[in-house]
Amino acid sequence: MIRRLQYLYHMQLNFELPVREHHFKLRCFPSTDARQKVFNERIEIYPVHFSSTEKDSFGNTCVYGTAKQTHDHFSVDVQGEADIDIDRQLKDEEYKVGIFKYETPLTKAGTSIRKFHLELEPAVLYPNNFERAFYIMNMIYDDFSYVQGVTGISTDAEEAFNLRRGVCQDYAHILLALCRLERIPCRYVAGMIPGEGATHAWTEIYDNGVWRMLDPTHNRECDDTYIKISSGRDAKDCSINQGVFYGGGKQTQEIKVKVSVI
């Protein structure tokens, strides 16, 4: 059964002082793959002088552009629809996924995570990567609490694990850190789920030639209500907005997301 979802994404940067010659890279656009088909997508960027669309090294859709004129805010609005079919799995060749076996600065396992890993049941008890990752996810969920405001975008897995508190990015980074200790290929996913709020983060586990999705924040396998925006080794690879400009002073960012079932 295919589920159709409608999505709205809004991001706005507000600058304390005017900026100019703003060169940006945006990564906030769902792409069509085996599992999801995106259509009726509309994109509005303000201000913009020039833009082009390309794929990054992980296959994520990116828009590169320039806003030359002076401005005190910068915004992007994306809306569209997506058909999700969880029976169609995202396949990948094994030789392509090796990069996702290894830690990154944000998913590096320190003393606490390694100690936690030693206390887990032996991996031999689980028949495949997915079942093993599912067990690890359960153990994280029992030992971690969802709390906003105690971590930030630069918080790594070890720091969040020591706090035993954090948000979806932290849950995902901790699961990736533990799976990579066992050389299970796994990656970070940024996307959207039903309701109103911000973007969400979860993981993909490589198992027998396909990527299967786990949401450690909600302790479950992802269903047909998840819209994928991007994936990579960690949250840094899925950064929504990157840019350089002249001027600006302090800046604040607003993100609003709405996903509904049609």
Task: For each feature predicted by the language model, list its residue ranges.
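Hydrophobic/aromatic-rich core segments of domains that either
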Residues: D170-F245
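Short flexible/disordered coil segments
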Residues: H71-D77, Y206-E221, G247-I262
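Short, surface-exposed linear segments at secondary-structure transitions and domain or protein termini
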Residues: P47-S52, G98-E103, E221-K228
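Domain-scale recognition of soluble eukaryotic interaction modules
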Residues: Q89-K91
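Glycine-rich, small/acidic residue-mixed loop/short-helix segments
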Residues: I2, L26-I43, N219-C238, G248, ...
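Secondary-structure boundary elements
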Residues: I84-I86, K96-G166, I174-L178, A235, ...
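Intrinsically disordered, low-complexity N-terminal segments that are enriched in acidic
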Residues: M1-I84
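A short local loop/turn or secondary-structure capping micro-motif enriched for an aromatic residue
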Residues: T61, I84-I86, R220-D224
